[in-house]
């Protein structure tokens, strides 16, 4: 609301409970936004449709690469140990629990991101009648993770559950927000797919810079909505969206490439390089060779430090530096 008040003070008009029916492109590069209460002529349109972003995108003939999943959190009854604290507990994010745990008043708020058994929602499209309703809670689906939460924070096992909140949340294939120009359209922008909205509260500032100045003060490549092309079809988005949800709180190494949706795009050299022992990662959907197995080094573990493959990479660098080599960088084109 404070942002809305500031916008209105600066001259913006806000129309609520007014569904958009059509978005039509004009030869002037403007848009006619047809609503239930009339048509608005707009120089720019921003798709900030949240769960409805794919439906909004469909109005202008584009596919928005995100999927909705159910996410639950619960609030407990009060606990005397929390009531007696002089300061609030810090927020805990635990990979084994796959959950966040924090104090809520004199109780706890706990929200698992299930490592398995997550539940996608509205895969066949959103119902325009949906208006921020919540779903029935399903604690049985969370029990393996709640049991671990009780081990992590034993007072959780000593209180009852007061409230279970279950609602939809959007996830993109890589779990980064979709922001920036829509490929193939002029003056149409995306600002959607935010699965952790509180962490991206300032993203509107950078979209505004992009729209007004054509660039931003930050490198937005990892968030640019054009990073997904036609190759990221609906099945891919569903598979990767589910994976994004289920690895949300998994500790992943810097050298780790997610397993789902692989071998999506390949160069003509893919098969030959794989036969020669190439270990592939993913760049823009392309299988990109990272290093080659040797007789001594056949794999590397997930790590944030120098991996077991480092000596093999050193041999490859020396070969290219001292002789010659061909490097497949199709995914960087």
Segments predicted by a language model, with ranges:
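C-terminal catalytic lobe of FAD-dependent flavoproteins
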Residues: 2, 96, 105, 119, ...
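Central beta-strand plus flanking loop segment that forms part of the substrate or channel wall
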Residues: 62-86, 144
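Flavin (primarily FAD) binding-site architecture
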Residues: 44-62
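Glycine/proline-enriched, intrinsically flexible loops and inter-domain linkers
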Residues: 218-219, 224-333
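Helical element adjacent to the flavin cofactor pocket in flavoenzyme catalytic cores
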Residues: 1-44, 52, 201
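Phosphate/diphosphate-binding loops
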Residues: 78, 86-104, 255-272
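Short hydrophobic-aromatic micro-motifs
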Residues: 100-102, 108-112, 190, 288
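Short Gly/Pro-enriched turn/cap motifs at secondary-structure boundaries
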Residues: 64-68, 89-93, 99-100, 160, ...
């Amino acid at each position: 609301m404070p942002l809305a008040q500031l916008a209105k003070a600066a001259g913006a008009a806000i129309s609520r409970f007014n569904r958009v029916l059509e978005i039509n492109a004009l030869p002037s590069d403007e848009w006619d936004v047809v609503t239930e209460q009339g048509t608005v002529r707009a120089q720019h349109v921003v798709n900030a449709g949240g769960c409805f972003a794919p439906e909004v995108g469909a109005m202008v003939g584009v596919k928005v690469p995100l999927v909705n999943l159910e996410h639950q959190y619960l609030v407990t009854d009060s606990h005397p140990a929390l009531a007696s604290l002089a300061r609030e507990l810090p927020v805990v994010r635990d990979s084994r629990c796959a959950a966040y745990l924090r104090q809520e008043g004199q109780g706890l708020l706990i929200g698992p991101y299930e490592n398995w058994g997550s539940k996608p929602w509205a895969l066949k499209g959103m119902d325009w009648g949906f208006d921020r309703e919540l779903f029935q809670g399903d604690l049985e689906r969370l029990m393996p993770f709640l049991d671990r939460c009780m081990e992590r924070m034993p007072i959780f096992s000593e209180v009852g559950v007061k409230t279970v909140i279950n609602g939809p949340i959007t996830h993109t294939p890589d779990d980064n927000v979709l922001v920036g120009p829509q490929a193939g359209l002029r003056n149409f922008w995306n600002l959607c797919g935010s699965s952790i909205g509180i962490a991206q509260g300032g993203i509107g500032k950078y979209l505004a810079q992009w729209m007004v100045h054509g660039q931003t003060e930050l490198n937005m490549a990892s968030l640019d909505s054009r990073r997904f092309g036609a190759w990221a079809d609906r099945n891919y988005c569903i598979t990767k969206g589910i994976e994004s949800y289920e690895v949300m709180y998994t500790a992943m190494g810097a050298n780790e490439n997610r397993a789902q949706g692989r071998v999506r795009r390949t160069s003509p050299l893919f098969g030959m390089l794989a036969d020669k022992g190439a270990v592939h990662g993913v760049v823009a959907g392309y299988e990109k060779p990272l290093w080659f197995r040797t007789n001594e080094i056949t794999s590397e573990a997930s790590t944030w430090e120098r991996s077991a493959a480092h000596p093999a990479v050193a041999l490859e660098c020396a070969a290219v530096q001292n002789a010659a080599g061909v490097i497949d960088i199709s995914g960087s084109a």
